[in-house]
């Protein structure tokens, strides 16, 4: 089989359509799956010895949240090292990273796999992976044809990364130096709320403004602070963390501003405070609402004049520190109640950010679950950790009062429970492995129990034949319209019909 000019042109056109990189990448992956008649396809970006999914088709949604470290995925490592088309034999001993992650085929393992590394010059920037359930599924395509596909995808990905880099540099102050070597914090989520938050982080990071990050407990406020710091001109300097809620009043001032020898009992030497440690960098004050009014006044002075005094010292020290503060309280209400200084609130909230709770983030819960599943897999040395359909349904309907932190702990606990009840190193998380209270799931549709007169394979094929016949009849035997009605692509429908003996 050879690609026609029309096929290649169609792929190129899809890469120019859409309003953003994510949309273009999704169109590319969907088109490739149709052209190559594969069961699953994915576009991955390479970063710091791991592959990060950018777009998928035919794979479980939680794949978008997973981070595939090379040391934990030998097939992906082979693709990264190859420099050319990689075809894995059906009997390859290397585990496929997508085993159990094709919806409806969780118990089956992928048979055919092709990997296409993507390069910008000599630099690896990503990969395309193509998977199928039939061992010889990609034999009809030559390496040269697959290289053409890889070249188109590499060009699109390279341009997207270049535009991203230029946009980031354009937001920097004129005298700022790009810092490409800094690893960027991964903020997982594609929901509207998270997309907007990422845009706001990108905007404010390039400035030197103080930022007030608000959100419920467990939403990831510290991660937001890290993302701001790492995307700022201060990224080459330290990010210093201080939890204000954990500070006893007796040592709080010393922790913030330092002390000199003999300033108080136990001060046996000079000690720098968090502000000195963060000089030329960023200081993250978590739970800022817990500071006493006396300390709030001293913090306000630092923000106003940029100098500090160590406890027991009359001299002032100049510091250049950007302050990021976080709270799970409504500081406006705290100001009205007299528990928080209004002038400090206005100093801190020059650019306020709000982190949405997990219950408002839609399918992000599945992406995050995939991320935590992959973390558990690596930590426990398992070959795979996947979510069953029932587990995904449960996660999507639970409200998570503890937000992302609660989800993380729930996944870790479920993996441990599932591992204890299953032999081997493969774990499938079922709904019963989660101990969520008061979860109301949509009621299942009632169905009569049929009398079994044939084996499971025969019953499945009979059902598929009848479903296809009915769909064809309703669509005047138009296979494309039939495929749309059945919510599958036409190439897969033709292959299924042939296997069922409905087509020559």
Swiss-Prot record:
SUPFAM superfamilies: GAF domain-like (SSF55781), Homeodomain-like (SSF46689), P-loop containing nucleoside triphosphate hydrolases (SSF52540). The modification 4-aspartylphosphate is found at residue 57. It comes from the Bacteria. Gene3D superfamilies: 1.10.8.60, 3.30.450.40, Homeodomain-like (1.10.10.60), P-loop containing nucleotide triphosphate hydrolases (3.40.50.300). ATP binds at residues 215-222, 278-287. GO terms for molecular function: ATP binding; ATP hydrolysis activity; DNA binding; DNA-binding transcription factor activity. Pfam families: GAF (PF01590), Sigma54_activat (PF00158). Residues 187-416 form the Sigma-54 factor interaction domain. InterPro entries: AAA+_ATPase, GAF, GAF-like_dom_sf, Homeodomain-like_sf, NorR, P-loop_NTPase, Sigma_54_int, Sigma_54_int_dom_ATP-bd_1. This is Anaerobic nitric oxide reductase transcription regulator NorR. The gene is norR.
């Amino acid at each position: 089989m050879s690609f026609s000019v029309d096929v290649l042109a169609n792929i190129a056109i899809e890469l120019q359509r859409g309003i953003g990189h994510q949309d273009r990448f999704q169109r590319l992956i969907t088109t490739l799956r149709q052209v190559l008649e594969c069961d699953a396809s994915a576009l991955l970006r390479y970063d710091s010895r791991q592959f990060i999914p950018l777009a998928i088709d035919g794979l479980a949604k939680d794949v978008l949240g997973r981070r595939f470290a090379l040391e934990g995925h030998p097939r992906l490592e082979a693709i990264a090292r190859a420099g050319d088309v990689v075809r894995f034999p059906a009997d390859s001993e290397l585990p496929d990273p997508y085993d159990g992650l094709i919806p409806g085929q969780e118990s089956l393992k992928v048979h055919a796999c092709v990997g296409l590394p993507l390069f910008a010059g000599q630099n690896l920037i990503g990969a395309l992976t193509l998977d199928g359930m039939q061992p010889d599924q990609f034999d009809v395509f030559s390496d040269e044809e697959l290289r053409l596909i890889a070249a188109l995808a590499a060009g699109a990905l390279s341009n997207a990364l270049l535009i991203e880099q230029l946009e980031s540099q354009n937001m920097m102050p004129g005298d700022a130096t790009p810092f490409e070597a800094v690893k960027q914090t991964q903020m997982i989520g594609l929901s509207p709320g998270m997309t907007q938050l990422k845009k706001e982080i990108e905007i404010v990071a390039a400035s030197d403004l103080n930022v007030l990050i608000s959100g419920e407990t467990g939403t990831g406020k510290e991660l937001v602070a890290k993302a701001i710091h790492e995307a700022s001109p201060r990224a080459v300097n330290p990010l210093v963390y201080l939890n204000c809620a954990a500070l006893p009043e007796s040592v709080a001032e010393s922790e913030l501003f330092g002390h000199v020898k003999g300033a108080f009992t136990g001060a046996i030497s000079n000690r720098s405070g968090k502000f000195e440690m963060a000089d030329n960098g960023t200081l993250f004050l978590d739970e800022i609402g817990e500071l006493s009014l006396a300390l709030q006044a001293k913090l306000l002075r630092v923000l106003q004049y940029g100098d500090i005094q160590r406890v027991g010292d009359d001299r002032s020290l100049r510091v250049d520190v950007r302050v990021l503060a976080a709270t799970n309280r409504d500081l406006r209400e705290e100001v009205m109640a007299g528990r928080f200084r209004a002038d400090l609130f206005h100093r801190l909230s020059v650019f306020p950010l709000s982190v949405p709770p997990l219950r408002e983030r839609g399918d992000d819960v599945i992406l995050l679950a995939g991320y935590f599943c992959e973390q558990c897999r690596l930590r426990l040395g398992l070959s795979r950790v996947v979510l069953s359909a029932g587990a995904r349904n449960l996660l999507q309907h639970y409200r998570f009062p503890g937000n992302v932190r609660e989800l993380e702990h729930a996944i870790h606990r479920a993996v441990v429970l599932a591992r204890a009840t299953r032999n081997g190193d493969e774990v499938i998380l079922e709904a019963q492995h989660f101990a969520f209270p008061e979860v109301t799931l949509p009621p299942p549709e009632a169905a009569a129990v049929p009398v079994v007169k044939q084996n499971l394979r025969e019953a499945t094929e009979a059902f598929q034949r009848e479903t296809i016949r009915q769909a064809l009849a309703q669509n005047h035997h138009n296979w494309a319209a039939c495929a749309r009605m059945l919510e599958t692509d036409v190439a897969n429908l033709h292959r299924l019909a042939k296997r069922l003996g409905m087509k020559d």
